[in-house]
UniProtKB/Swiss-Prot annotation:
The Asp-Asp-Xaa-Xaa-Asp/Glu (DDXXD/E) motif is important for the catalytic activity, presumably through binding to Mg(2+). The lineage of its organism: Eukaryota, Viridiplantae, Streptophyta, Embryophyta, Tracheophyta. GO terms for molecular function: 1,8-cineole synthase activity; magnesium ion binding; terpene synthase activity. It is found in: Plastid, Chloroplast. Keywords: Chloroplast, Lyase, Magnesium, Manganese, Metal-binding, Plastid, Transit peptide. It comes from Arabidopsis thaliana (Mouse-ear cress). The gene is TPS23. A motif (DDXXD motif) lies at residues 342-346. This is 1,8-cineole synthase 2, chloroplastic. Predominantly expressed in roots and at much lower levels in siliques. Not found in leaves, flowers or stems. Also detected in flowers in cv. Landsberg erecta. Not expressed in root apical meristem and elongation zone. Found in the vascular system of young roots and additionally in the cortex and epidermal cell layer of older roots.
């Protein structure tokens, strides 16, 4: 599997010099593409436009970016610091709270992937001690430690009951809970987002109480602690469990450096590692930018979104660790094809043309290319070649033919696109339930995640392929639903203005007569419910294989990425209006400056 996934040790040593060589089978070139073939129709058709702006990222500029703080010297320094951090984890003299805070810092600083075994061993030990002692949080000083332990254990797949908060819940319900420990309240708030549907007290008591207390704190003009106030604002804006990990790492590095008790070794290790990982991401980005330019799709199809950087940004949210560069590159190609085909169905194609394209994808027969309108031929040929190429790589190195499953995922996607196109063309207004039955697939998450499974898994299971292909993996449906609803909340005003099919908010309004505000609140609650379901899926994940846990984490990361991308509007289609440009700049372009004399 060395060709598909280079070992982490090799990546760490050669982040700047290694170039992936993605071997592809011979490309099929249809003769009809080598000559000008006019469309059969002579009727001038009225085509819609998405009014998308050109890419804010110039190809030549992307090829020029580099991180000057990620040289071989920095790699050596990082590895020295890594040993020091490992000794902190191995220190048996640390208290329970010190252990928990160190793990939390490593995770938020984006370096926990170096210490997965050590972290799992520590959490396993803490979980066993918790089970033996059967203790509950009944003191103010325990609030932060208990909340943090609950969140970290559940996040890592350990089964922990909400009953450890029973004493505090009783005090909240009787209005006798008094505390000035805002850090403990923030930890309690963050812990509440690891809830499942059965955790009624986390939902109905702890989360509303903690949210109210944090709001009072940030609204208090007498609050002097700027560090804690920023932390509180950040939590209220979006809980940590729902945030895109890598973007939050960039925020937390700056926040951690301002802490009065920050650890100098830890912050320098995190900053150097961030730059080294960023350098790996920059090489990925250059590769996919070259690929995108070589497809000529933006020249041939000027109506589609030119968003290769944004498509790569999604993959960093999906899996950021440097050793997974091959996966990020493949998934960026998948994302770019999804975006292109979505625009053909959403904006440009007539129903007759879209039915032809759907049939072509279902049959997967490149010899029928001439039946398509000319503007669709290049798109289908690139889809055909790329998916067959991915399947060929997997067959060579993993000894299983996944092409039937991959092509089915594209056929399913195109069929749902076609349903929405028919709804729009015919002015049909579906109920929310009918809309969601189609929309959780049309948002492309099932297509994305089956490709991710195939390139990520060392041992591909036919049973897993079947359940993914037949849309029977519940965590995929939950992730897809969050993606769909977040997309609807962020994009529906723009899409409705150009005349698209109703989205979830409008379906609910049309069906119930609710106001837009109430409808949006309902959609937000649907998102929260899906997170509860995903939390249930991972509640006992510590008993699963690392690859199984990795797939579930990727599904959750896709949901996290969607809430990042659509947090301030359409961050994918209109990145200039939704903070995407600034976020990409901070993650993929701008390095973190280093003080070479700081460590002495």
């Amino acid at each position: 599997m060395a060709t598909l996934r280079i070992s982490s040790a090799l990546i760490y040593q050669n982040t700047l010099t290694h170039h992936f060589r993605l071997r592809r089978p011979h490309r099929f070139v249809c003769k009809s593409m080598t000559k000008t073939t006019p469309d059969t129709t002579l009727v001038e058709l009225s085509r819609r436009s998405g009014n998308y702006q050109p890419s804010p990222w110039n190809h030549c500029y992307l090829l020029s970016i580099e991180n000057k703080y990620a040289s071989e010297t920095e790699v050596i320094t990082r590895d020295v610091l890594k040993k020091k951090v490992k000794s902190m984890l191995d220190d048996e003299k640390k208290s329970r709270l010190e252990q928990l805070e160190l793990i939390d810092d490593l995770q938020k600083l984006g370096v926990s992937y170096h210490f997965e075994i050590e972290i799992n061993d520590t959490l396993t030990d803490l979980h066993l001690k918790m089970g033996r002692n059967c203790w509950k949080c009944d003191k103010e000083e325990d609030l932060h430690a208990t909340s943090l332990e609950f969140r970290l254990l559940r996040q890592h797949g350990f089964d922990v009951s909400e009953n450890i908060f029973d004493v505090i819940i009783d005090q909240i319900e009787s209005n006798t809970f008094k505390t000035n420990n805002i850090n403990g309240i923030i930890s309690l708030y963050e812990a509440s987002y690891l809830s499942t549907k059965s955790d009624t007290k986390l939902h109905k008591v702890i989360r509303p109480f903690a949210t109210e207390q944090i709001r009072k704190f940030v609204d208090d003009e007498d609050t002097k602690n700027i560090e804690v106030r920023e932390k509180a604002y950040h939590a209220l804006e979006m809980p940590y469990h729902w945030r895109m990990r890598r973007l939050d790492t960039r925020w937390y590095i700056d926040a951690y450096e301002k802490k009065h008790d920050m650890n100098l070794v830890l912050i320098e290790f995190a900053k150097i590692d961030f730059n080294i990982v960023q350098a790996a991401h920059q090489e990925d980005l250059k590769y996919v930018s070259r690929w995108w330019k070589d497809t000529c799709l933006t020249n041939q199809l000027p109506f589609v979104r030119d968003r290769i950087v944004e498509n790569y940004f999604w993959t960093v949210g999906l899996i950021y660790e440097p050793q997974f560069g091959y996966i990020r590159r493949i998934m960026t190609i998948v994302n770019a094809l999804v975006t292109t085909i979505d625009d053909i169905y959403d904006i440009y194609g007539t129903l007759e043309e879209l039915e032809l394209f759907t049939s072509m994808v279902e049959n997967w027969d490149v010899n029928r290319l001439g039946e398509l309108p000319e503007y669709m031929r290049l798109c289908f040929l690139i889809l055909y070649n790329e998916i067959n190429g991915i399947g060929c790589d997997i067959l060579k190195y993993k000894k299983i033919d996944v092409i039937p499953y991959l092509k089915k995922s594209w056929a399913d996607l195109c069929r749902t696109y076609l349903v929405e196109a028919k709804w729009y063309k015919r002015g049909y207004k579906p109920s929310l339930e009918e809309y969601m039955q189609n929309a959780w697939i049309s948002i492309s998450a099932p297509t994305i995640l089956i490709h991710f499974y195939c390139v990520f898994s060392d041992q591909i299971s036919v049973q897993n392929l079947e359940t993914l292909s037949q849309h029977r993996q519940h965590i995929v449906r939950c992730s897809a639903t969050v993606l769909r609803l977040a997309n609807d909340l962020g994009t529906s005003p723009t899409e409705l203005a150009r005349g698209d099919v109703l989205k979830s908010v409008q379906c609910y309004m049309h069906e119930t007569g609710a106001s837009e505000e109430r409808a949006r609140d309902h959609v937000h609650q649907m998102i929260s419910d899906m997170w509860d379901d995903m939390n249930s899926e991972t509640k006992t994940a510590c008993n699963s294989s690392s690859r199984s846990r990795g797939f579930k984490e990727a599904a959750m990361n896709l949901a996290r990425m969607s809430q990042c991308m659509y947090q301030y509007g359409d961050g994918h289609g209109c990145p200039e209006k939704a903070k995407t440009i600034d976020r990409v700049q901070s993650l993929l372009v701008d390095p973190i400056p280093l003080d070479v004399n700081r460590l002495g």
